[in-house]
């Protein structure tokens, strides 16, 4: 979700060694993100193809508020590294449509000086509490920076 040109998709392709990744969809509300991602990662795609590694990044222009269960239930991992840019009800909409035991990775921060940050949490406990009724086995992490803290939680979609 909020794919940021597919950066995380390419990190997963290069670094995730536990099992083969068959398919990665990177979703963005900005239709230009697909074009930027394709240009940005064209050399990486060429390198992967030359090296015999297929690239499975599907750029999707989608409004997450309209995602349906039949689309979301095919994924075993869903990430959003920019929760601060999304309304909480929209994040909840996605999580509510995931199948049980889907691995969910969410990141946010407490940086208040960006007018595009519409959904920040004051601390990791507040961020984590947003998902206590939706996720099980939650692990929480904080990365301090000079002007703000970055939060990450990892959990599995609670059984419905």
PLM segments and residue spans:
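Short beta-strand element of Class I
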Residues: 21-27
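Conserved beta strand-loop-helix elements of the APE1-like EEP
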Residues: 154-159
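Conserved beta-strand/loop positions that form the S-adenosyl-L-methionine
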Residues: 1-2
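Conserved SAM-binding loop of SAM-dependent methyltransferases across substrates and taxa
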Residues: 5-19
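A short SAM/SAH-binding and catalytic strip from SAM-dependent methyltransferases
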Residues: 74-89
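S-adenosyl-L-methionine
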Residues: 34-73
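C-terminal substrate-binding/active-site "lid" region of AdoMet-derived donor-dependent transferases
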Residues: 87-151
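Conserved SAM/SAH-binding beta-strand->alpha-helix loop
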Residues: 29-32
